[in-house]
Amino acid sequence: MELTSLEARVIGCLLEKELTTPDQYPLSLNSLALACNQKSSREPVLSLSESQVKTVLDDLTKKRLLSEQSGFGSRVVKYKHRFCNTEFSELQLSSAEVAIICVLLLRGPQTPGELKTRTNRLHEFADVSQVETALLALSQREKPLVVQLAREANKRDCRFLECFSGNVDDYDVNSSDAIVVSNHTQQTLQQDSKIVELEQRVKLLEQKLAQLESLLN
């Protein structure tokens, strides 16, 4: 799955608002434009017009990463993502992974410490090792969803880049050093992976049950 930088911004905004303001989700074009142009929690800060955002929405719809929805008696079209964790998306992520991908889409490369701080409204990580666990799982998928960048000069921690829109060729990738994680992270990774797998199975069963109930009704 490849995204342009603007598509990444839109998907990131939809993921964020779905979690932080669920009563206002899906989003109208106006709300989505405001979210894309937010001055906080966005790097870089943009100034997109509604027509520019609509063009991006049309492109995402063609990629089947977006769906439109209109309320009963309302002419306002609203938009919701099909990026992950829906019956239409192949990509299934844990809540921790969604939070990390969301921040990386909205803010670019981040260190584990930065991610722990900046995901606080999306998912509660007890410590940095839990962030590292999720990053390790994302990086070790058959098609990696994040990549660790080489440590910058005079910096203690490496940053991570999402692989959907991040142009890896523009960065120095950490090809020599293994991803540094704590002992706790290494010990719990397998357990967390099993939990994620079970959560995904439960979600699929719930979706199938809902489909059966709709047929019976």
Curated annotation (Swiss-Prot):
Organism domain of life: Bacteria
Family: Belongs to the UPF0502 family.
Protein name, per record: UPF0502 protein Sfri_1696
